[in-house]
């Protein structure tokens, strides 16, 4: 498969991107998400994340406002989050 060199992105970089993360109800979920994002976006602070329980209380939802410089950085954050054991879905 040939990789496209000139991909057209709908996102203009750099930007602040809202990552939506759903995961397990766990006391360390919020910190785990924050720590994982910080691996690729070290300037991300605790006040950049908000969490809320799902309607039935089975999951926790988090929104992280992340400053990203390019598509590669955003892709790396997605890969890191989706591979975390407490994370179910990343949008």
From Swiss-Prot:
Q: What is this protein called?
A: UPF0250 protein NMC1112
Q: What is the lineage of its organism?
A: Bacteria, Pseudomonadati, Pseudomonadota, Betaproteobacteria, Neisseriales
Pfam families, from UniProt? Answer: DUF493
The UniProt family comment states: Belongs to the UPF0250 family.
User: What organism is recorded for this protein?
Assistant: Neisseria meningitidis serogroup C / serotype 2a (strain ATCC 700532 / DSM 15464 / FAM18)
Q: Which SUPFAM superfamilies match?
A: YbeD/HP0495-like
């Amino acid at each position: 498969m040939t990789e496209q060199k000139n991909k057209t992105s709908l996102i203009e970089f750099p930007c602040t991107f809202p990552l939506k993360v759903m995961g397990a109800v766990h006391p360390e979920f919020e910190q785990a998400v924050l720590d994982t994002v910080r691996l690729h976006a070290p300037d991300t602070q605790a006040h950049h994340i908000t969490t809320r329980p799902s309607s039935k209380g089975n999951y926790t939802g988090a929104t992280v406002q992340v400053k990203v410089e390019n598509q590669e950085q955003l892709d790396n954050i997605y890969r890191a989050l989706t591979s975390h054991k407490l994370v179910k879905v990343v949008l």
